[in-house]
């Protein structure tokens, strides 16, 4: 077998018999195949949740494995870390080996036809540097390369296949980023496109600009206006009359329903007709805020029709795209989702009005917030009113809302949610529920991602194995060294290639084996999508100890903040169960949404009502998760609350903490972890003392006893220490295991 000197392309052929599909069709490509380069493979790995630097290294490793010994087909192992036999050596499939020989002949024929193809030098180079492999071999090699970099996933093989289908344009996804002006949609879409590997990013402003080239400003001033002051170009009387007619039509419909249900429907009809007649000639003019929303809706309706045609063309070509813009009103988006199953919408907003206002300073010509020189500041009331309207519509339709105060976490949350929705769509679920006119599936996935991020932010993940057991577990470690939660992990797969998870918890003698028992092995691992990736794992239901009071309060605060809207006082969970049936199935929105005067933006977005909205999305406000002991700690910071003995012990701890920060030795890491461990001394611990024995070791090697009444000065001191020396915890667990 001739060894390929350089591999630039990997042609992945569908099917097991590569001899039939390797035949060239005259265009220099193979039928039913896809050509992967290193950047394309790297983008595919990033789409399935790998970090960018890991995706770069894994793609390079895959090409090295494919290159070595003729795509590594006849090598004794695919992965040094697993010592796994080759698929062909393990099964002894002679026909598969014959297919590989035929595929290699295609590569060798390229060198024989050099003289015939001198007019196409690039085609010759491409054939010389191309290796043809089957889909199964390609997936196996990539999965083994992922295992070398300690990537563990619930269904990693299925995620890789799904990511390949998106990259090969066998499936597509359309991400919609809704939101008003100044909330960071353009920046978010650019970063998200880079993360997902989507090169088509379209703004609705560009669609509006294209439409303006076909009509003069005098002919259609509404189209030439900005969304936040488009209401100025509407006739208030005409708008009021139109809304009055719609209200009368709804009342007539309700009268007909009452007449059909009750025998006294005629009397009710007469009373309703008198009410309608009394307001027929006196339409009530709308407020300026309602006119701003009506102008926004009118311009959005013009843009959304052209966007509908574009999405139809993209879906026919299986092209993934990201669309962002203020014209993506949620009632219009629901109409689009009924026609286009590839849409995944998100609502981007800024809860803090001051931060929202600061974003407009960079858009002004003179970097100022002067309303005379900055039009965004001048119309900030209308912008906030439109955002309030969009947020309420998002709550009604259960569209996930992203408080875009931290761009990195916003991108990570959207990325993980989009891929989770693709998994469920691949399983046959519909993202849009036409009965309730909601997207509860997307909302559930987003909440799962937020819950997973909140859970995993309290510790670190390690792959553990109990002593005397062959079962591997994914464990979430608390900062004190105990296990908060575990998930089963196994390398076995079924006939379809999906992993088989073991759930046995009983030993041979019938005694239950504790999860928190003695450890035989513990090593850190990488999860797809980072902290958000644990949401895809099935819960094992086994924990070593109950969570601490602080952890419970943090989880409660985080969960409650996700279920409540930042723009509406009613819970989102209750709205999902009592959602009324959809009345209008067209792309146009319903008309009852602005019957009442929208509330002041200041009341909906005030800092007092939204203290749970932190600068970092997914984190919990520290002030809302403090236990009684922590408040006592803060109160004791004042010298008037300290006794002489406590003052002396506090100074001793302060000096020791400063010394630890300077030296940063391994023993100091254990002492700092011990300080945090003693904070939960009053809680019931079932973890063996051997697990944390190394944490009690000080510089001279002796065991040091601490009094529970000695408090730390600040919570942030221990957290920052662990953040700098996080590896010390893993060493402590390994030393604690017999």
Curated annotation (Swiss-Prot):
Residues 564-574 have a biased composition (Low complexity). Residues 592-607 have a biased composition (Acidic residues). Residues 251-267, 577-591, 608-628 have a biased composition (Basic and acidic residues). Gene3D superfamilies: P-loop containing nucleotide triphosphate hydrolases (3.40.50.300). Disruption phenotype: Strong reduction in seed phytic acid with a molar equivalent increase in inorganic phosphate. InterPro entries: P-loop_NTPase. Residues 270-283 have a biased composition (Polar residues). GO terms for biological process: myo-inositol hexakisphosphate biosynthetic process. Coiled coil: none annotated. Residues 245-283, 564-646 are annotated as: Disordered. This is P-loop NTPase domain-containing protein LPA1 homolog 1.
């Amino acid at each position: 077998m001739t060894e390929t000197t350089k591999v630039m392309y990997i042609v992945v052929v569908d099917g097991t018999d590569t001899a039939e599909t390797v035949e060239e069709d005259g265009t220099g490509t193979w039928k039913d195949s896809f050509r992967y380069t290193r950047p394309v493979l790297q983008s595919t790995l990033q789409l399935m949740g790998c970090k960018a630097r890991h995706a770069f290294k894994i793609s390079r490793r895959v090409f090295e494995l494919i290159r070595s010994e003729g795509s590594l087909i006849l090598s004794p192992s695919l992965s040094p870390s697993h010592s796994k036999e080759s698929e062909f050596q393990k099964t002894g499939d002679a026909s598969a080996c014959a297919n590989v020989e035929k595929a290699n002949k295609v590569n060798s024929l390229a060198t024989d036809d050099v003289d015939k193809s001198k007019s196409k030098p690039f085609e010759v180079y491409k054939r010389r540097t191309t290796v043809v492999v089957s889909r199964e071999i390609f997936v196996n090699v990539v999965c083994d390369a992922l295992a070398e970099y300690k990537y563990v996933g619930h269904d990693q093989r299925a995620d890789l296949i799904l990511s390949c289908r998106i990259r090969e344009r066998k499936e597509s996804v359309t991400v919609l980023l809704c939101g008003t002006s100044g909330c960071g949609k353009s920046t978010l879409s650019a970063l998200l496109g880079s993360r997902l590997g989507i090169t088509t990013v379209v703004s609705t402003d560009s669609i509006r600009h294209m439409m303006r080239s076909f009509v003069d400003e005098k002919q259609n001033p509404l189209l030439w206006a900005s969304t936040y002051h488009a209401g100025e170009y509407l006739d208030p009387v005409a708008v009021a009359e139109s809304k009055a007619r719609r209200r009368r039509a709804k009342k007539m419909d309700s009268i007909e329903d009452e007449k059909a249900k009750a025998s006294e429907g005629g009397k009710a009809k007469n009373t309703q007709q008198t009410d309608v007649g009394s307001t027929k000639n006196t339409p009530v003019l709308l407020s300026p805020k309602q006119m701003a929303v009506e102008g926004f809706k009118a311009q959005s309706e013009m843009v959304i029709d052209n966007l509908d045609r574009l999405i139809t063309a993209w879906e026919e070509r299986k092209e993934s795209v990201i669309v962002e813009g203020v014209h993506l009103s949620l009632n219009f988006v629901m109409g689009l989702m009924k026609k286009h199953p590839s849409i995944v919408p998100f609502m981007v907003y800024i809860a803090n009005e001051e931060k929202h206002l600061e974003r407009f300073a960079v858009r002004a010509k003179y970097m100022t917030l002067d309303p005379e020189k900055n039009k965004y500041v001048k119309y900030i009331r209308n912008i906030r009113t439109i955002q309030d309207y969009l947020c309420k519509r998002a709550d009604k339709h259960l569209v996930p809302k992203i408080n875009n105060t931290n761009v990195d976490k916003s991108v990570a949350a959207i990325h993980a949610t989009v891929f989770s929705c693709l998994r469920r769509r691949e399983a046959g679920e519909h993202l849009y529920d036409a009965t309730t006119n909601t997207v509860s599936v997307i909302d559930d996935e987003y909440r799962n991602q937020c819950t997973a991020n909140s859970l995993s932010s309290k510790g670190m993940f390690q792959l553990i194995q109990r002593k005397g057991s062959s079962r591997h577990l994914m464990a979430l470690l608390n900062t004190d060294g105990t296990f908060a939660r575990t998930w089963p992990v196994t390398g076995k797969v079924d006939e379809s290639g999906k992993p088989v998870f073991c759930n046995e918890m009983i030993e041979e003698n019938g005694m239950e084996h504790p999860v928190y028992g003695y450890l035989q092995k513990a090593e850190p691992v990488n999860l797809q999508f980072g902290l958000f990736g644990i949401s895809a794992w099935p819960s094992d239901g086994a924990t070593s100890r109950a969570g601490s009071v602080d952890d419970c309060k943090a989880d409660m605060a985080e969960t409650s903040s996700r279920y409540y809207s930042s723009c509406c006082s009613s819970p989102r969970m209750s709205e999902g169960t009592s959602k009324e049936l959809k009345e209008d199935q067209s792309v146009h929105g319903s008309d009852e949404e602005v019957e009442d005067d929208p509330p002041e933006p200041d009341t909906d977005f005030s800092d007092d009502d939204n203290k749970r909205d932190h600068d970092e999305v997914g984190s919990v406000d520290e002030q809302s998760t403090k236990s009684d002991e922590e408040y006592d700690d803060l109160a004791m910071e004042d010298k008037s609350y300290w006794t002489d003995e406590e003052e002396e012990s506090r100074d001793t701890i302060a000096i020791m903490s400063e010394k630890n920060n300077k030296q940063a030795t391994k023993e100091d890491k254990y002492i700092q972890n011990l300080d945090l461990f003693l904070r939960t001394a009053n809680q019931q611990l079932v973890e063996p003392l051997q697990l944390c024995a190394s944490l009690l070791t000080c510089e001279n090697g002796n065991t040091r006893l601490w009094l529970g009444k000695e408090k730390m000065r600040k919570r942030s001191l221990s957290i920052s220490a662990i953040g700098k020396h996080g590896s010390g915890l893993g060493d402590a667990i390994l030393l604690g295991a017999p």
